[in-house]
Swiss-Prot record:
Its EC number is 2.5.1.157. GO terms for molecular function: 18S rRNA aminocarboxypropyltransferase activity; S-adenosyl-L-methionine binding. It comes from Methanobrevibacter smithii (strain ATCC 35061 / DSM 861 / OCM 144 / PS). It holds the Pfam family Ribo_biogen_C. Belongs to the TDD superfamily. TSR3 family. The lineage of its organism: Archaea, Methanobacteriati, Methanobacteriota, Methanomada group, Methanobacteria. This is 16S rRNA aminocarboxypropyltransferase. One of its GO terms (biological process) is enzyme-directed rRNA pseudouridine synthesis. S-adenosyl-L-methionine binds at T17, L67, L90, T109. It is found in: Cytoplasm.
Length: 171
């Protein structure tokens, strides 16, 4: 499974999950947006379409691309988001990384990539990419029911419906 991460050099390198992923041989870091593979699914928190099983073939053929930047600076990374026609956002999930533990939707790069792989039914790869992170298994355990429901949804609209039903049940 091809995983590429555009690294914006805005993070604390000691806590950076994409740098650790690269050291573990689980992704390729790029620092130039022109090095991002065309046709890959690009994770984009501003995308109108949620990742779903209908993205399976794009992830399988071209991979997934994460953006590693500060959540405080993500809106300034808009240039990154013009690179692919397969921009996808992630549905509601809860972070378990040490920096944002328990915060909804503020995922680390490795959590976002893992969630994308899980939702597109690359579940073994989703688990594997979290190996090497002490808290990695916690992400899948805490979000298990949602990830399963999202992975069973065939389309982006179905994923959004599952998300909305979950959020409404919590009100």
């Amino acid at each position: 499974m091809k995983v590429t991460v555009f690294h914006a050099n805005e993070c604390d390198r000691k806590k950076c999950t994409s740098i650790k992923m690269e050291k573990l041989g689980k992704c390729k870091l790029v620092y130039n947006i022109n090095k991002i593979p065309s046709g890959a699914v690009v994770l984009n928190p501003f995308a109108q379409k949620a990742v779903s099983y209908e993205d399976y073939r794009y992830v399988h053929r071209r991979g997934v691309v994460g953006l590693d930047c500060s959540w405080n600076e993500v809106s300034s990374s808009k240039k990154f988001f013009s690179l692919s026609k397969y921009h996808r956002s992630l549905p509601f999930l809860i972070a378990t990384n040490p920096v944002n533990y328990g915060k909804p939707c503020i995922l680390s790069t490795v959590e976002a990539v893992s969630a994308t792989l899980y939702i597109t039914r690359f579940k073994d790869e989703a688990k594997d990419i979290l190996d090497g992170f002490k808290w990695g298994h916690t992400f899948l355990e805490l979000n298990h029911d949602l990830l399963e429901a999202y992975s069973e949804a065939d389309t982006s609209k179905d994923v959004v419906r599952v998300q909305n039903e979950f959020l409404e049940s919590k009100e």
